[in-house]
Amino acid sequence: MTLKEYKSGQAFPGVIGRTFDVSKPACPAPNRAREGAPNVLFIILDDTGFGHLGCYGSPIKTPNLDALAADGLRYNNMHTTALCSPSRSCFMTGRNHHSNGMSCITEGSTGYPGGNGNIPFENGMISEILLQNGYNTYALGKWHLTPAEQTLSLIHI
């Protein structure tokens, strides 16, 4: 039973003990990542290649990224469209950019199949998979996955 299903006047389905630690709420415990599950951090950078990060042998000093890479996974075989929106949509869904409706950057959405700038709901995103497995998710920074006509532009105010 969830809290939304619990109605006043019904028998309380939980347990109210003398202390919190021996009490049980009416709703089930939230899904949690398994014990020892790794932390997951994705960093997506535009206009960056192997020659820009120290962890790939670059002379450019990137100590914080190098430290993260030393304790995590580093990808060295990848595909890019050389455009941010299509590449980001591939990364976020694990699908080809045309199946995501991202044949180009969202400002260039064509309205044709594979180029409407809208990721289909059924394609899902990695954040949804993580949530289903008890992870908390957070996105920060440039999104650039919405067609221009669906965003607020200061030019039109």
Over which residues does each language-model region extend?
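Formylglycine-dependent sulfatase
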Residues: M1-I155
